[in-house]
Design a protein with these regions (language model features):
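Bergerat-fold GHKL ATPase/HATPase_c domain
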Residues: 1-46, 95, 109-110
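Structural motif corresponding to the C-terminal cap of alpha-helices
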Residues: 26, 30, 49-53, 100-108
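Conserved ATP-binding N-box helix of the HATPase_c
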Residues: 36-61, 124-131
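ATP-lid-like helix-loop hinge signature
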Residues: 47-77, 81-85
């Protein structure tokens, strides 16, 4: 056991930086470092997809719950902007996934991008990325397919080459797909029950979007799936 220090001086003060701001104190963002906090992190990614649907972009949201406890959320929205932002002089993927308090939902009252939105605007995607063991993001927009890979809050790839860009493989279709594994080094429990995806506030919000039903798929090791429309009364079917 380390000996307790008795000196409390100027060098005793330190600041958490980058991913450590969430990884060491997840409760500050998500309200808990337990299962509820982990569920909140999932809610943040789901709510981004639902915000797109409620604005009329995309008709289906698919949430897949894998046996290894990773989660995938895929929408048919406009696709998260991830390319270079001349105004901020940074890539948007850095702002969205690696910078707290950055996003496109701060001017809602002006009708800028969203009339209304769920979640921790400007915090959710980044905080969930920071708290994950890994995260894979794929975006289809502007005629391109953009791919990103993160591990424990950090982008993977050579500096300047983290964002992979290739011609789209979906024609004119756009959208965002996010798959990640909540990190047990951050949360004490990541075994989210299937009913959460049906009964969560995000699911209820999706059910109110009549033109955009959200579909839950529970994937098994044999790759079979069970689907149900996300509404307050729906339940996940057992494969």
């Amino acid at each position: 056991m380390a000996q307790k220090k008795t000196v409390y001086g100027n060098e005793s003060i330190s600041a958490l930086k980058g991913a450590e701001r969430v990884r060491k104190r997840p409760g500050v963002i998500f309200g808990s470092d337990g299962l509820e906090g982990c569920e909140h992190s999932v809610f943040e990614i789901m709510s981004n997809a639902i915000d797109e649907a409620r604005e009329g972009h995309g008709r289906v949201i698919t949430v897949t719950r894998y046996n290894d406890r990773s989660i995938q959320v895929e929408d048919m929205g406009r696709g998260c902007p991830v390319d270079y932002n001349p105004k901020e002089k940074r890539f948007n993927w850095e702002l969205v996934y690696c910078e707290l308090y950055a996003g496109g939902k701060y001017n809602n009252l002006d009708g800028d991008n969203y009339e209304y939105s769920l979640g921790l605007n400007g915090l959710g995607a980044c905080a969930t990325q920071y708290s994950s063991r890994y995260m894979d993001v794929t975006v289809w927009r502007d005629g391109n397919k953009y791919s990103l890979h993160f591990e424990r809050g950090e982008p993977v790839g050579k500096k300047g080459d983290e964002l992979r860009i290739e011609p789209t493989d979906r024609g004119r279709k756009t959208g965002t797909r996010t798959r990640w594994l909540p990190d047990l080094d951050v949360f004490t429990d990541i075994d989210i029950p299937a009913d959460y995806y049906v009964e969560t506030r995000a699911s209820r919000s999706a059910s109110k979007t009549k033109s955009s039903p959200a579909t839950l798929r529970r994937r098994t090791s044999s790759t079979k799936t069970a689907s149900s429309t996300m509404s307050p009364r729906s339940r996940v079917k057992t494969p």
